[in-house]
């Protein structure tokens, strides 16, 4: 998730137990610089034959009027219930 000025953006995606994921078994990658933070979800590695396809689903939600998080206990009170 990402929090900014009272808004919380949450991105959900599945982890498939026993699947082969890239980058040492990770199902996400992050990138950050002074302007942005990116979280990219990754699906498992698969071998596709001609005419085959695969899919990867993300579910996004945006929550508003979230109080500023000042302590770890605030996460439990305001954020966990939204996950």
Please state what every model-predicted region is.
Residues 1-55, 65, 69-77:
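A contiguous, surface-exposed recognition patch within enzymatic or periplasmic domains that forms
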Residues 59-61:
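Short, surface-exposed secondary-structure boundary micro-motifs
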Residues 77-83:
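Short, cationic low-complexity segments
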């Amino acid at each position: 998730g990402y929090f900014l000025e009272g808004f919380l953006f949450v991105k959900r995606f599945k982890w498939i137990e026993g699947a082969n994921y890239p980058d040492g078994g990770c199902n996400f990658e992050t990138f950050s610089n002074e302007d942005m933070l990116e979280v990219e979800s990754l699906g498992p590695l698969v071998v596709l034959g001609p005419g085959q396809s695969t899919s990867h689903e993300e579910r996004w939600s945006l929550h508003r009027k979230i109080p500023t998080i000042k302590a770890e206990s605030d996460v439990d009170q305001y954020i966990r219930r939204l996950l």
